[in-house]
Curated annotation (Swiss-Prot):
UniProt GO molecular function: adenine binding; adenine phosphoribosyltransferase activity; AMP binding; metal ion binding
Cited HAMAP family: Aden_phosphoribosyltr
Xref: NCBIfam families: apt, PRK02304.1-5
Keyword list, A-Z: Cytoplasm, Glycosyltransferase, Magnesium, Metal-binding, Nucleus, Purine salvage, Transferase
Protein name: Adenine phosphoribosyltransferase
EC number(s) from the headed UniProt entry: 2.4.2.7
Main location: cytoplasm
Gene Ontology biological-process annotations: adenine salvage; AMP salvage; purine ribonucleoside salvage
PANTHER family hit by this protein: ADENINE PHOSPHORIBOSYLTRANSFERASE
Presence of the UniProt keyword Coiled coil in the record: no
GO cellular component: cytoplasm; fungal biofilm matrix; nucleus
Length: 188
């Protein structure tokens, strides 16, 4: 393994040790892993951004697209670390000016996202970031919006992944998660 991969793995291990677990949240049978404690400690927040920056390496990234709302927590900071712009993907009616809109399927129904039409130039290289990859519906929707702008999706980045939901199967660009989440549902 390269030194870079070893460093990312060490950072991921330390970050994962700082998660809090909540059994049966938000519903029975789910073990919720809360990554918000990372943001209460500046050294951990810096390590989260460093791990993603190390992963991206020397790839040229023009924009980081963050999903509402947890993609907003680290997306702008990662964009700054990569010398890239940050572009939010939001629920309908939250962005001024002309927007592209997409409807996507989630675990329990459908939802919509929007992105401003004129903020990403055609051919720009983008990362799409969010906290958790679950069913892949939200990330898929953001990817469809990125395509409408003419951007090239370099990769989807997530802090965690609920592997058993197979959300990465819905995405048509490489997927990277700092650490995998649950492989199956929680049972007591």
């Amino acid at each position: 393994m390269s030194d870079r991969v070893l460093e990312i793995n060490a950072l991921a291990k330390e970050l994962k040790a700082n998660l809090k677990q909540f059994p049966n949240f938000p519903k029975e049978g789910i073990l919720f892993e809360d990554f918000l404690p990372i943001f209460t400690k500046p050294d951990l927040f810096n390590k989260l951004v460093k791990a993603f920056k190390l992963h991206v390496g020397e790839q040229k990234i023009d924009y980081v697209i963050g999903l509402e709302s947890r993609g907003f927590l680290f997306g702008p900071t990662l964009a700054l670390a990569l010398n890239a712009g940050f572009v939010p993907v939001r629920k309908p009616g939250k962005l001024p000016g002309p927007t592209f809109k997409v409807e996507f399927q989630k675990e329990y129904g459908s939802d919509e996202f929007e992105i401003q039409q004129d903020v990403i130039p055609k051919g720009a290289k983008v990362l799409i970031v969010d906290d958790i990859l679950a069913t892949g519906g939200s990330a898929f929707g953001a990817g469809e919006l990125a395509k409408k702008t003419g951007a090239e999706i370099v990769e989807y980045l997530f802090v965690m992944e609920l592997d058993f939901l197979k959300g990465r199967d819905k995405l048509d660009a490489p997927v990277y998660t700092l650490f995998g989440g649950q492989e199956e549902k929680f049972t007591e």
